Curated annotation (Swiss-Prot):
This is Lysophosphatidic acid receptor 5. It comes from the Eukaryota. Glycans are attached at residues 4, 170. Residues 47-54, 117-135, 208-238, 297-367 are cytoplasmic. One of its GO terms (biological process) is behavioral response to pain. Receptor for lysophosphatidic acid (LPA), a mediator of diverse cellular activities. Disulfide bonds join 93-174. Residues 1-25, 76-95, 157-186, 260-275 are extracellular. It is a multi-pass membrane protein. Residues 332-350 have a biased composition (Low complexity). The chain crosses the membrane at residues 26-46, 55-75, 96-116, 136-156, 187-207, 239-259, 276-296. Belongs to the G-protein coupled receptor 1 family. The gene is LPAR5. Keywords: Cell membrane, Disulfide bond, G-protein coupled receptor, Glycoprotein, Membrane, Receptor, Transducer, Transmembrane, Transmembrane helix.
Length: 367
């Protein structure tokens, strides 16, 4: 246990956060169990199988990397919520807090870039075609990472663990409340700036671009094709993630920041209630890393075909193994022995080529 005893001042008694810690422990365990393999597989598919040829796959690859980074930090949070105190060095508390903010704002921006790319491809296919190149997409993603890293610096500085007393001992808390002095100082302006650049602008861009695309595709002269259906699924999935994961958390966070900064007068009881809501909404924001892989699967044909290609050799090897076991169970007559050798050799010498199940295309129709 990390104990920071001080002879100068006795810390206050630790608040009872155990009920909300138990909720976070359950939800984040599910997010880790599902999000880690899903995003690791997605990143492997984009980098190794699809080779990130299309513009949308570039954005999806970076989105998967952001989600994977967050899921890798979850064991620190799970240990904290299980023990109800921070047992690690202080810098890991700061790092885990910064990774969450980077993932949330990074996910908002990467989803926005996906939507804007669909807007450029369907509403302005000729005017904006120079922006729809993989090289431009990679430069934009590099700029996004630079932006969220810059905003991570004040987050790291603000996420200092706080000390309190529990059972006669000093313990450290993480991911809880910042001090009133910090809220009234530089934290609130930084929060509002991050909300404007990392959430409000992306939300406005997603709503506008999705609306224009839906309007264009709904016209009587619009081409009805499989590409149209994929685009609609992709945009709807992005809207659902924004409305379900990001809007509730960011709206509650803005209200809580205004209350803590005393921009809006409120009683301490009202602030506690808003904080309780915020602690639930943060779970929705963290759950986006489980929903994003569903966007890849249902919207990206190349991604789906790759997963089918991975399943094919596994199925063939299972069938070959079952055939060999059945042959060994038969009486070892000369005919049965010959049949067994034939079946087994075919299963070994003619495996399914996992690359033959799909042909990744460089066009948008295969994103």
């Amino acid at each position: 246990m990390q104990a920071n005893s001080s002879a100068k001042s006795l810390p206050t008694e630790c608040p009872d956060y155990q009920p909300i810690h138990h909720l976070h422990l359950v939800v984040y365990s599910v997010v880790l169990a599902a999000g880690l393999p899903l995003n690791a597989l997605a990143l492997w598919v984009f980098l190794r199988a699809l080779r990130v040829h299309s513009v949308v796959s570039v954005y999806m690859c970076n989105l998967a990397a952001s989600d994977l980074l967050f899921t890798l930090s979850l064991p620190l949070r799970l240990s904290y919520y299980a023990r109800h105190y921070w047992p690690f060095p202080d810098f890991l508390c700061q790092l885990a807090g910064a990774v969450f903010q980077m993932n949330m704002y990074g996910s908002c921006i990467f989803l926005t870039l996906i939507n804007v790319d669909r807007y450029a491809a369907i509403v302005h296919p000729l005017r904006l075609r120079h922006l729809r190149r993989p090289r431009v997409a990679r430069l934009l993603c590099l700029g996004v990472w630079a932006l969220i890293l810059v905003f991570a610096v004040p987050t790291i500085l603000a996420h200092q663990p706080s000390s309190c007393a529990r059972d006669g001992r000093n313990v450290s808390l993480c991911f809880e409340s910042f001090s009133d002095k910090l809220w009234k100082g530089s934290l609130l302006p930084l929060l509002l700036l991050a909300e404007a650049l990392g959430f409000l602008l992306p939300l406005a861009a997603v709503v506008y671009s999705s609306g224009r695309v839906f309007w264009t595709l709904a016209r009587p002269d619009a081409t009805r094709s499989q590409r149209r259906r994929k685009t609609v699924r992709l945009l709807l999935a992005s809207l659902v993630i924004f409305l379900l994961c990001f809007v509730p958390y960011n709206a509650t966070l803005a209200v809580y920041g205004l209350l803590r900064g005393e921009v809006v007068p409120a009683s301490s009881e009202a602030r506690k209630k808003v904080r309780g809501v915020l602690m639930v909404m943060v779970l929705l924001a963290g759950a986006n890393c489980v929903l994003d892989p569903l966007v890849y699967y249902f919207s990206a044909e190349g991604f789906r075909n790759t997963l089918r290609g991975l399943r094919a050799p596994l199925r063939d090897r299972t069938l070959a193994a079952n055939g060999a076991q059945e042959a060994l169970a038969e009486p070892l007559t000369e005919t049965a022995h010959a049949s067994t050798l034939t079946t087994t050799s075919q299963g070994q010498l003619q495996p399914s080529d996992p690359r033959s199940s799909f042909t990744p295309s460089h066009e948008d129709s295969s994103f």
